Amino acid sequence: AKLRESMRFEIKEIQRNLGITVVYVTHDQTEAMAMSDRVFLINRGVVQQKGTPEEIYRQPVNQFVADFLGKVDFIKGEAGGGRILLHHTEVSLPYAGDKTGAVEVAIRPENITMSKETGDIEGTVTAGYYLGDAGDYRVAVGGISLRVITEGRVFREFTPGDKVFLSLEDFIVYDDDGSLEEQLKINT
């Protein structure tokens, strides 16, 4: 694994020094993100999205792309009246889009802040795993489970059974057919 990681840097440096185009085909998400200036994400022979690694990660055009790159929770909801009510919860998110009716909300776990004191959404920690540089948690919110990633140094602050409060930094709204409806930034 360490050799593979160091080779990423070496290949990228050679490409940059020579000023050449390199086509690199991989199923490894980390390699694709780390080594690419441009990514073409293909599913069944059809380009789903092309762009910089950051564009594709932060603004995935459909649920396939969002799910393929990184970790994400998809939650069904109902849009209307400037809000999205998440199914199986009491959670209502602000929504400025025009869509009404069925939607699916995509939330990346690193875009959730978890606290014991304050936040917009109340939940209960059901599991937590120490990963060294990160804590990987599952938090029950009503009838759904959200994944939350924290810095490793705060891992011991939260244990299963703890009541916690979550705040979302941003989320993505998809139409019920899986296509991008809107990306929303919260508290920015």
Predicted feature residues:
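ABC ATPase nucleotide-binding domains
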Residues: 1-64
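A generic "binding-loop/recognition-motif" signal
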Residues: 29, 52, 61, 71, ...
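Non-catalytic connector elements of ABC transporters
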Residues: 72, 83-188
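C-terminal boundary and immediately downstream tail of ABC-type ATPase nucleotide-binding domains
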Residues: 58-80, 106, 167
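Gly/Ser/Thr-rich helix-start
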Residues: 46, 52, 67, 71, ...
